[in-house]
Amino acid sequence: MGLAIKIALDLKIKSTIIEKTIPKIFFEGRLQYIKKGKLRRFVLKNEKIILDGAHSNTSGKNLYNYLKTIKLPIYCIWGMQKNKFPSEFLKNFKGIFKKIVTVKIPNEKNSCTTAELKKIASHQNYRTETAKDFKQAIKKITSKEPKVICFMGSLYFIGSVLKEN
């Protein structure tokens, strides 16, 4: 997907066309727009939810390349495994997120704590706070402002979110 976006951008395809086309392509847990289900109950109609299991530098760069085509403010809910180099991973998103809310991946021993992720995000000058779970994280972000809420950092994390949805 990321390579396809890169090629489209290199071919000077308008970002508006890319933005309209990508939601029609489906890879579970990869740039997955949530249009129905329990998650939608937590947000307003003018808020979009994207799930992406990006957890490596390469997948982070690919996600960044897509997110930078979005014109709305983007907020992040971030859960990640300790062995995936979270500090390096987050560097891929400079200037993208208006705010990051960190969460621990449920039932994962190797998950970073909310405090560990908050410290990483704060050191990279992000507005950040913690939440006990992704539902509380959504509550800390949702408002009347149109926006995109991007869940990212781990396929385990995205899987747990999808299970709840």
Specify the residue positions occupied by each region the protein language model found.
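Short, active-site-adjacent cap segments at secondary-structure transitions
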Residues: 137, 157-159
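H/E-rich (His + Asp/Glu) clusters that bind or coordinate divalent metals
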Residues: 122, 158, 164
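Short amphipathic alpha-helical segments
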Residues: 62-64, 89-91, 113-115, 162-165
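Active-site-proximal loop/hinge segments that shape catalytic or ion-binding/gating pockets
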Residues: 154
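C-terminal helical cap/extension that packs against the catalytic core
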Residues: 9, 44-51, 90-148
